[in-house]
From Swiss-Prot:
The lineage of its organism: Bacteria, Pseudomonadati, Pseudomonadota, Alphaproteobacteria, Hyphomicrobiales. SUPFAM superfamilies: Ribokinase-like. One of its GO terms (biological process) is galactitol metabolic process. This is Tagatose kinase. Its EC number is 2.7.1.101. It holds the Pfam family PfkB. Induction: Up-regulated by growth on D-altritol or galactitol. Disruption phenotype: Deletion of the gene does not result in growth defects for either D-galactitol or D-altritol.
Amino acid sequence: MRQASVLAPHTNGPTVTAGEILVEIMATTVGDGFLEPQTLIGPFPSGAPAIFIDQVARCGGTAGIIAAVGDDDFGRLNIERLRRDGVDVSAITTIADRPTGSAFVRYRENGARDFVFNIAHSAASETRMTDEAQALIEKAGHVHIMGSAFAIAGIGAIILEAVKSVKARGGSVSFDPNIRKELAQGDEGRRLIDDLLAVTDLLLPSGEELQAASGLDDEEAAIEKLLAAGIGEIVLKRGANGASHFSRAHGRIDAPGLEVEEIDPTGAGDCFGATYLTCRRLGMRPGKALVYANASGAHNVTKRGPMEGAASLAELDAFMAAQLSEEVL
């Protein structure tokens, strides 16, 4: 049983992730799917790893991503957004004969969403360990793992190599197990999750993901099992109800959500996790980091487009102040 782990400070090197970059194109009307011509808006830069790493940079952290895009405008708009916001894009490869990934999204009347994805056959599937990717890994102080990235050929191996390298230098790892519970029930999926949990310093699950990670349905028992295994911090995302921090060092800390009008929830969890991680790596205590993370997720859902709600800490301060003023009035 390993000792409870801690997050590497920002001075150890940048936060690095690997995974899909895509564009999101959204229907402007509510309805069922894409079976008839309709008005669309976009393209917006997207992809969970890209949203996450963009928010790390917006919060003041050093950040880089290993990914692949097509030689097209969809790829260029993503690279330019990430570069503008301060992300190291040197390890993003341009693939000449594959398009940048895409996701078409339409909301139903009940709030559910219909998606049409092109990821498996996009440039993302050609992500490889290049010299630039290796150089980025060698200077990294922290690796963020997106569970969904393991569904894309080649990316899982890059992540595992990055974890091995960074851990050997005293760095740390965060893990967003954005995986469905049933995927964790097979032997291979369960082994992968257990291997990732064994190196995780910060776990960022939602409710169902907590069950998938722990194998337990009871929240309290699941948290205790994971902390006992040596994970330093668990931050449980509760959506509009806020979030909870659990650790041996600080116990349980709950932070309420902010009441906002939801425009587009895509990317809110990624912004939340990126903000919490970056605040902690910058030396902020868990309770304060949790407040900023909740604000980040809430701010993100008020904008149309998954990366359009990314915000700096100063912008989140202003957002929270405005929310407080509205409550007082």
